[in-house]
Amino acid sequence: MQVEGIFPNKVTFISILDVCSQRKYLGEGKNIQLCKMGFELMSDVSMCTAVINMYGKCGYLDDAIFLFENFEEKDIVLWNSMLALYSQRDEFKHVFRLLEQMMCEGFMPTKISYVSVFNVCANKEALCRGKWVHASLVNRSFGTDLEVGNAILNFYSKHHSLLNAKCMFERMTERNVITWSGMIAAYAQCGQSKEAVQVFIKMQQERVIPNEITLISILRAFDDKSMLDDIRKTHYFAMLEGLNKGVTLGTALINMYSKYGNIKEARSVF
C-alpha cells in the first residue's frame, strides 16, 4: 500500500490494530503504535482506544492502563473499553473505582458500562454493590435492555439469588437464547429441576432455539438418577440439532452418564 504511495489513515491503522489483538501479532501492533506516535496521531481517541483494546486482549493490562491514564481527551467509548478490560479480568474493585472516576468527570454510564459492571459483580464479594447498581437502574431507560438484562440475570444466577433472577426474567420485554439459558441455569443451580425443565419447554414453545450453553445448563438440573431419561432426551436433542460435537457439552454428557453408572452410554458420546 505504502509502496504504491498511498498513505495509511486512521481507519487503516485501527483495522490493523484490531487484527493485532492476538498475542502472536502483538509485536506488529506495537510497531504500528510507535509508527503512529511518530506521525503524531496517537492524540486521536479512536487510535488510543484501539491500542488499549489490543493490549487488553493480549493480556498486557499494565500497558493498557498506562496509555489510558496518560490520555487526556477521553470519551465514553474509551472509558467503556477500560471498564470491559477490568471486568474481563474479574477486577471488580478497579471496575467500581473507574466507574466512580468516570462519573466524577461528567460521563454518565451507558448500557455497555453496566454490562461490564454486572459481569464483574458475579464475584461473590460484589453482591451488595451489584444490587445497589441494579437499584439505580430502576428508572433508567435501559433498565430492561436485553443485553443489560442478561447481565443482571447472570449476576443474580451466579449468586444463587433465584427470586431476583426470576423477577428480572419476568420484567424483560425482550428475551433471547442467552436470557432463557440464564434462567434455566438459575433454577439448576438452586436445585429446582422441575422449574428448569419447564423453562426449557417454554423456551421452545416461544420458538427460541436452544444452543450448547442451554443444554449444558439443563443437564445440570438433572440431579437425580430418576432423571436419566431426561439426560437421554437432551442427548438426542443435541444430536438432532448438531450440537453434540461440542467438547464442553460432550464432557457434560459423559459426566452425567458416568455419575449414574451408565458407562456404556457415556462411551457412546464419543
Question: How would you name each of these model-derived features?
Answer:
Residues 3, 7-14, 19-25, 109:
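Hydrophobic or amphipathic alpha-helical targeting/insertion segments
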Residues 5, 38-40, 71, 75, ...:
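Inter-helix linker motif
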Residues 9-14, 29, 44, 48-49, ...:
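Pentatricopeptide repeat
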